[in-house]
């Protein structure tokens, strides 16, 4: 089998595609993959590092307001579609899978024009612009959230989850909190605002530090590499022995597997990882995303009893501390939330999406 994967712009579009490839290789080791991404996107570094063949296209996103730049965007898109057609004809895939981002729009649309089966995957509860555009011509559509079902043609959309969940759930963790000077016997709260960090979360942590120092649970704060020194400079109370402040964590899935509770943004990949592992969570959605989709992602977990949510305007040291205490000092609440998170998580998401791809090829 030969498959073209395309998704770009953010890790939330890229990692599900790579996780899917990992699952498919377990079922069909001889599968050939080609990843088509954008020239300037992070996928141009992430994908080649995995050893997967990679082709580049030049695309850019639309401006939300009227702009002459949108004329250039359309021109680049049409050129990218033409280039994508050549790539597709040369590779001759059985199916083309798009996981979102503007580059996948050009690639999947080109495949549709060439009458090649296409599958798109929507990771968020609010469908992205690209996937909405592609949905009419797609052979099959997989979504991660029930809330996304109504946004696509009902005869070809199915809930499959996020392949990243299956990848994380299968990891055997060798991590020990002792590696950073903490105990494996105490509950541990991980506060993580994403790979670049989240200033509002960092500020709330600074505000809560004096009280965190007094708790009998452990607190690990990941600031983001560029924000680490700033956080240390702004502390008025130094961390106690139960608190660690780190710029980043390289082996995040292994650390997550040993985490008692987490404070996190509500991006699709984070949600997939949290639910796959059944981690009680305090979600702080970013309000600076398209369609406010992180709030809707978070609300789906809150409605299921799998998470707490603090909106960014309501975030403070006190609010963060109260939420953390409610999870880490109340075993029954934590246990219930763990069970509900696992119920929400789809731990065989990669297998489900693979089955959908086979259905698309068979049509």
Curated annotation (Swiss-Prot):
Enzyme class, UniProt record, top EC level: transferase
Main location: membrane
EC number(s) per entry: 2.4.1.227
GO BP, one annotated term: cell division
Matching Pfam families: Glyco_tran_28_C (PF04101), Glyco_transf_28 (PF03033)
Subcellular compartments: Cell membrane
Role noted for this protein: Cell wall formation. Catalyzes the transfer of a GlcNAc subunit on undecaprenyl-pyrophosphoryl-MurNAc-pentapeptide (lipid intermediate I) to form undecaprenyl-pyrophosphoryl-MurNAc-(pentapeptide)GlcNAc (lipid intermediate II).
Protein name: UDP-N-acetylglucosamine--N-acetylmuramyl-(pentapeptide) pyrophosphoryl-undecaprenol N-acetylglucosamine transferase
Organism: Leuconostoc mesenteroides subsp. mesenteroides (strain ATCC 8293 / DSM 20343 / BCRC 11652 / CCM 1803 / JCM 6124 / NCDO 523 / NBRC 100496 / NCIMB 8023 / NCTC 12954 / NRRL B-1118 / 37Y)
């Amino acid at each position: 089998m030969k498959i073209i994967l395309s998704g770009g712009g953010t890790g939330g579009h890229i990692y599900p595609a790579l996780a899917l490839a990992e699952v498919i290789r377990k079922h069909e080791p001889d599968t050939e993959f080609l990843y088509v991404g954008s020239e300037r996107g992070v996928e141009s570094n992430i994908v080649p590092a995995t050893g997967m063949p990679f082709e580049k296209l030049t695309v850019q996103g639309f401006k939300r307001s009227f702009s002459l730049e949108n004329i250039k965007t359309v021109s680049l898109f049409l050129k990218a579609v033409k280039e994508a057609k050549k790539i597709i004809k040369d590779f001759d895939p059985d199916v083309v899978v798009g996981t979102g981002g503007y580059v996948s729009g050009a690639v999947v649309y080109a495949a549709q024009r060439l009458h090649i089966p296409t599958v798109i995957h929507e990771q968020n509860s609010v469908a992205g612009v690209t996937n909405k555009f592609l949905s009419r011509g797609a052979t099959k559509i997989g979504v991660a959230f029930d809330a996304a079902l109504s946004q696509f043609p009902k005869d070809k959309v199915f809930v499959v989850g996020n392949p990243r969940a299956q990848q994380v759930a299968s990891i055997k963790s060798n991590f020990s909190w002792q590696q950073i000077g903490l105990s494996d016997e105490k509950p541990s709260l991980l506060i993580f605002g994403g790979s670049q960090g989240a200033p509002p979360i960092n500020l709330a942590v600074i505000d809560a530090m004096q009280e965190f120092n007094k708790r009998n649970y452990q607190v690990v704060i990941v600031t983001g590499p560029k924000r680490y020194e700033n956080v240390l400079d702004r502390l008025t109370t130094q961390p106690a022995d139960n608190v660690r402040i780190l710029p980043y964590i390289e082996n995040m899935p292994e650390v997550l597997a040993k985490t008692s509770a987490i404070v996190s943004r509500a991006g699709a990949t984070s949600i997939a990882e949290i639910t796959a592992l059944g981690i009680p969570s305090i979600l702080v959605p970013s309000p600076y995303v398209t369609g406010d989709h992180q709030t809707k992602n978070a609300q789906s977990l809150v409605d299921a009893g799998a998470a707490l949510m603090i909106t960014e305007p309501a975030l403070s040291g006190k609010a963060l501390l109260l939420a953390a205490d409610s999870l880490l000092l109340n075993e029954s609440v934590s246990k219930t939330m763990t069970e509900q998170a696992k119920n929400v998580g789809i731990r065989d998401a990669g297998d489900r999406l693979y089955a959908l791809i086979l259905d698309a090829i068979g049509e």
